[in-house]
C-alpha cells in the first residue's frame, strides 16, 4: 500500500468525521438543555407563587346546592386545608380515604373546590366515597384553579387564619406528607397565636 493510498483513506475518514461532528455537537447541546427542562417539568418541583401571600379572591357557586359554599372571607379565622379535586381524577380517589380521616379527626377545617367537573358526577362521587368537606364550591371553568396556581388535581393548600397560603401539595396527600409536613406546620401556626 502506498503512502498516497494511506493518505486518501485518512482523508476520507477525516471528511466523514468532520461531516458527523456538527450533528454530534448539535444533539449534545439539545440533550444538555432538554434534560434539566424535563426534570423541572414535574409540577411537584415547581414553587407556588402564593406561599405566604393572601389567598386569591374566591367566590364560586356551590356544587348545585349540594352543600354550603364558601368565599375567600370564609378562609379567615382558622387554619384550613383547601383541596382541589374532580370525580374523573384517579389520584383524587387515591387520597380520598385520607381526606375522610382528616375530616373525622376534626384536626383541621377541610374545604373542597371541585375542578372542571359535572356537578352530578361530583355529587355521585362524594355520595359513593363519602364527603370529607365542611364546605364545597364548584370551579366549573377552572378559572379559580388558575388563580391559585393549580397545575392539576389533586392539589391541596394550607391556608393560615389570616388567609395566607402557607403550604401547597401537588398530587395525592399521603400519611407521610400529613404527618411530616402538614400537621407540624399547622401546629407551628397554632403556637404563634
Feature roles, as predicted:
Residues 83-88, 115:
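Aromatic-flanked redox-active Cys/Sec active sites in thiol-based oxidoreductases
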Residues 127-132, 139-190:
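Thiol/disulfide oxidoreductase modules built on the thioredoxin-like
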Residues 58-81:
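A short beta-strand-turn-helix
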Residues 1-61:
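N-terminal targeting signals for export/organelle localization
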Residues 93-130, 140-146:
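Structural microenvironment flanking redox-active thiols in thiol-disulfide oxidoreductases
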Residues 81-82, 110:
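Hydrophobic beta-strand anchors of alpha/beta hydrolase catalytic cores
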Residues 40-41, 61-67, 136-139:
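Short gly/ser/thr-rich secondary-structure transition/capping motifs
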Amino acid at each position: 500500500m502506498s503512502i498516497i493510498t494511506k493518505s486518501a483513506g485518512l482523508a476520507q475518514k477525516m471528511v466523514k468525521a468532520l461531516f458527523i461532528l456538527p450533528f454530534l455537537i448539535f444533539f449534545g447541546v439539545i440533550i444538555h438543555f432538554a434534560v434539566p427542562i424535563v426534570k423541572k417539568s414535574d409540577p411537584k418541583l415547581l414553587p407556588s407563587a402564593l406561599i405566604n401571600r393572601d389567598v386569591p379572591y374566591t367566590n364560586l357557586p356551590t356544587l348545585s346546592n349540594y352543600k354550603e359554599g364558601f368565599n375567600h372571607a370564609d378562609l379567615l379565622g382558622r387554619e384550613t386545608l383547601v383541596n382541589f379535586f374532580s370525580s374523573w381524577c384517579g389520584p383524587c380517589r387515591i387520597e380520598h380515604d385520607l381526606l375522610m380521616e382528616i375530616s373525622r379527626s376534626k384536626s383541621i377545617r377541610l374545604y373542597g373546590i371541585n375542578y372542571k367537573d359535572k356537578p352530578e358526577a361530583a355529587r355521585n362521587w362524594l355520595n359513593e366515597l363519602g364527603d370529607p368537606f365542611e364546605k364545597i364550591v364548584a370551579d366549573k371553568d377552572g378559572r379559580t384553579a388558575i388563580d391559585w396556581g393549580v397545575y392539576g388535581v389533586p392539589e391541596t393548600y394550607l391556608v393560615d387564619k389570616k388567609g395566607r397560603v402557607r403550604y401547597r401539595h401537588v398530587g395525592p396527600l399521603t400519611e407521610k406528607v400529613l404527618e411530616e409536613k402538614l400537621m407540624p406546620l399547622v401546629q407551628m401556626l397554632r403556637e404563634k397565636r
